[in-house]
Amino acid sequence: MSAETPFLDTPLLLYLLSADSGKADVAEELLRKGGIISVQVLSEFTSVCSRKLKMSYGEIREILTTINMVLDVRDLKPTIHETALDIAERYGYSFYDSMILAAAINAGCSLVHTEDFHSGQHIQDCLLIVNPF
């Protein structure tokens, strides 16, 4: 994957299940184009689906199977954890949000699609945050 391949944050995957058709359509289009996510994104998605959306693990597993076929899922490594500490300290994001940003940098992405961070902000001079909505 190249720097042009975006990293996708958890809410984008959750919008696939949203009643907000506008956001669901945007999320579907982004997934269709491909992207990179981390295991953290899968974990957050699973947690929200089971706890807030009351989905069964069978239903969740079915969706995750499709996500795993469409997106490049990256493992988390100690170096990502270390980078996340730096990002949290420098930019003031929560540690778990910083893990998303660090995973994107580690994957070589130059772009992260999310609505949870400051759109237009550059992180460590190599990652641009973009709100696709």
Predicted regions and their residues:
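Short, well-structured N-terminal submotif of metal-dependent ribonuclease cores
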Residues: 1-38, 52-62
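Short, conserved active-site loops that position catalytic residues or coordinate cofactors/metal ions
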Residues: 39-47
